[in-house]
């Protein structure tokens, strides 16, 4: 789940979405969405044994935006099918994240009233206005789940089961 400020898995934006922090950048290099030199050109924090989430967030999202521009030039054949299959949660999640960005990262209850109240006209206008940003968040989930399913298949072949936890404090 994508985490909120404080980076706690129990303070997330979705119970369904995968955390973009776990998208493997080397994998994106192999897919020609990023270049190794681009990944190496960004700061990742001063200490190898400590995660600086602020620095990581800034660098990672800049790189993911670069990957997105390349992704748009040749969307994979299965991308649209993924978006349709996961539409029950992905459509609203991607819209929410795009609106959160458009509102400076502020909480939804501080947004324009018609958006807060999910008025159909306001949501339709937002979907049109922020279509590219929505696509970015859909791409992040596509990449996350593509990698997740490959990892899960690999470890399951080795007789390893993965267990996890569900974020229940979504607000």
Could you describe each region identified by the protein language model?
Residues 1-171:
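Acidic/aromatic-lined carbohydrate-recognition and catalytic surfaces
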């Amino acid at each position: 789940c994508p985490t909120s400020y404080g980076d706690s898995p129990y303070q997330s934006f979705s119970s369904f979405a995968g955390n973009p922090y776990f998208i493997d950048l080397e994998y994106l290099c192999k897919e020609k969405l990023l270049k190794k030199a681009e990944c190496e050109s960004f700061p990742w924090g001063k200490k190898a044994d400590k995660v600086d989430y602020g620095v990581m967030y800034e660098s990672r999202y800049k790189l993911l935006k670069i990957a997105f521009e390349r992704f748009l030039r040749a969307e994979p054949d299965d991308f649209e099918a993924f978006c349709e299959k996961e539409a029950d949660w992905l459509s609203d999640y991607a819209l929410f994240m795009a609106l959160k960005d458009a509102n400076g990262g502020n909480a939804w209850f501080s947004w324009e009233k018609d958006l807060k109240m999910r008025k159909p006209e306001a949501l339709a206008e937002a979907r049109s206005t922020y279509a590219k940003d929505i696509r970015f968040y859909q791409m992040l989930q596509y990449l996350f789940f593509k990698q997740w399913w490959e990892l899960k298949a690999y470890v399951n072949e080795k007789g390893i089961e993965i267990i996890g936890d569900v974020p229940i404090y979504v607000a």
